[in-house]
C-alpha cells in the first residue's frame, strides 16, 4: 500500500469530450439565459451545463504527512461505494442510498455531526430527484445544509469529484457554505439559496457516475 498518492482529474471542454452527453440529451436547453441554466434541485431544471478544468489532491497517511511536514488540510474518515442504476445515465434511489449509508458506517459518526452535503446534483430532472430522495431517507429527522457547487461551476465531468472535495474543504476552512444558485422552488432538503456563514468540521460529498457508480466521501477538519 502506498503512503502517498497524487490523485485528481482534468477535463477539457470540446465537442468530442461532451458529445456523449449531448447524445443522451443531458444538456439544458435554457440558451436564452445561460447564467441560469445550471439549477440543481430547482423545480424548473432541465439539464446540465458542461464545464471543465483540473483538480489534484495529495492523499496520504497521517504518518507520511507528519514526517514530511505537510500542512494537513482535512482527513477522509468515511468512504462508501455502490454500483446500481436504472439506466446508463440515471441513478436510482437504492444505489446512492447504500453509498451514503456505507460511508456513514465507515466513518463511525452520528448523522447530526455532518453539517454540510455537497451533492452530486447536476441539474437533471431524474438524477437530482433520486439523489434528493436518497439523502432525505438516510438523513430523516436531520437537516444538514445541502448544495451542489455545480450551480456555480457547471458539470466538470470527470474532474467534478476531485474539485468538489476541494471546494468543500475551502468552505470548511473559511467557515461558510456556498449557495445553491438559481434555486427558487422549495424542496424537502435544507437547500440555501444564499451564502451561509457558519463553522463546521465535517462534510459529505457525493459523486455519482454513468452506469450507476455511486461514491460518497466524509471528510473532517484536522484541528
Model-inferred region functions:
Residues 24, 103, 134-138:
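Alpha-helical structural signal in soluble globular domains
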Residues 32-107, 116:
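Condensing-enzyme catalytic core mediating Claisen C-C bond formation in acyl metabolism
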Residues 1-64, 158-223:
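Conserved beta-strand-centric core segments of catalytic alpha/beta enzyme folds
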Residues 120:
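Glycine-centered flexible beta-alpha turn that most often forms the glycine-rich phosphate-binding loop
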Residues 85-96, 123-139, 156-163, 194:
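Short glycine/threonine-rich loop-to-helix capping motif typified by GTGT followed
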Residues 71-75, 109-113, 145, 178-181:
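Flexible, glycine/charged-enriched surface loops at secondary-structure junctions
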Residues 142-154:
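Conserved phosphate-binding/catalytic loops in two-lobed NTP-binding clefts
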Residues 101, 115, 136, 147, ...:
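Generic hydrophobic alpha-helical scaffold/packing signal
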Amino acid at each position: 500500500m502506498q503512503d502517498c498518492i497524487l490523485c485528481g482529474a482534468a477535463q477539457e471542454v470540446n465537442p468530442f469530450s461532451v458529445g456523449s452527453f449531448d447524445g443522451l440529451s443531458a444538456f439544458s436547453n435554457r440558451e436564452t439565459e445561460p447564467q441560469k441554466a445550471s439549477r440543481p434541485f430547482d423545480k424548473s431544471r432541465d439539464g446540465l451545463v458542461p464545464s471543465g478544468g483540473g483538480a489534484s489532491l495529495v492523499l496520504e497517511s497521517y504518518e507520511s504527512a507528519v514526517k514530511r511536514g505537510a500542512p494537513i488540510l482535512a482527513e477522509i474518515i468515511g468512504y462508501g461505494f455502490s454500483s446500481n442504476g436504472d439506466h446508463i445515465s440515471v441513478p436510482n434511489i437504492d444505489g446512492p442510498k447504500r453509498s451514503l449509508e456505507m460511508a456513514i458506517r465507515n466513518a463511525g459518526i452520528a448523522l447530526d455531526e455532518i453539517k454540510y452535503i455537497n451533492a452530486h446534483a447536476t441539474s437533471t430532472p431524474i438524477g437530482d430527484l433520486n439523489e434528493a430522495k436518497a439523502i432525505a431517507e438516510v438523513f430523516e429527522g436531520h437537516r444538514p445544509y445541502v448544495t451542489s457547487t455545480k450551480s456555480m461551476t457547471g458539470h466538470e465531468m470527470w474532474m467534478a469529484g476531485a474539485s468538489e472535495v476541494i471546494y468543500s474543504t475551502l468552505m470548511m476552512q473559511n467557515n461558510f457554505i456556498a449557495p445553491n444558485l438559481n434555486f427558487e422552488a422549495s424542496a424537502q432538503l435544507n437547500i440555501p439559496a444564499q451564502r451561509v456563514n457558519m463553522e463546521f468540521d465535517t462534510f459529505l460529498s457525493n459523486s455519482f457516475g454513468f452506469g450507476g457508480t455511486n461514491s460518497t466521501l466524509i471528510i473532517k477538519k484536522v484541528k
